């Protein structure tokens, strides 16, 4: 960077417009992780991610290719959360407390003793299916304030990354 650019939490960008795009994709990646857990089960665990201004890439442990209907269910679930315009909140807590609370975390992550836990939802609206947080994850941020800021989420590719590891590439529009 040579002293130029923006750094917010886990993301870096060359300007504010780029940071806004990456922030939308970053929060969408959290929703993708949570949706994969809900659709495929808790054997899913993150192995890595990469966010550019064009797309997010998410690598996770899973032992087979996803079926087209599973990909659609994941994508639909993420978009349902986006349309619900859920509030994204953050709280600081000791790492062990965060893990016990059920917050997702990157197994290779090197975390400080006190971490930020970002939660998406619950919804305050009556009749909402989101009475509990949809996503709860240890992260440095930054994130959108409401999921409605993300835009439409679309999975563009699902493939093998390595033995037992799948990769999803997705965009927001």
Model-found features: residue ranges?
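A glycine- and charged-residue-rich anion-binding loop/surface
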Residues: 1-173
């Amino acid at each position: 960077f040579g002293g130029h650019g923006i750094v917010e939490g886990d993301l870096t960008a060359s300007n504010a417009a780029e940071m806004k795009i990456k922030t939308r994709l970053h929060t969408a990646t959290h929703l993708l992780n949570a949706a994969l857990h809900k659709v495929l089960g808790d054997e899913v665990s993150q192995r890595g991610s990469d966010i550019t201004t064009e797309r997010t890439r998410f690598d996770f442990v899973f032992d087979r290719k996803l079926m087209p209907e599973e990909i659609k269910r994941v994508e639909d679930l993420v978009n349902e959360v986006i349309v619900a315009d859920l509030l994204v909140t953050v709280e600081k807590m000791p790492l062990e407390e965060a893990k016990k609370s059920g917050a997702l975390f990157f197994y290779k992550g090197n975390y400080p003793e006190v971490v930020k836990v970002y939660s998406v939802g619950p919804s305050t609206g009556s009749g909402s299916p989101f009475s509990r947080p949809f996503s709860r994850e240890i992260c440095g941020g930054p994130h959108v304030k409401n999921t409605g800021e993300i835009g439409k989420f679309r999975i563009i590719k699902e493939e093998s990354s390595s033995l037992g590891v799948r990769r999803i590439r997705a965009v927001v529009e």
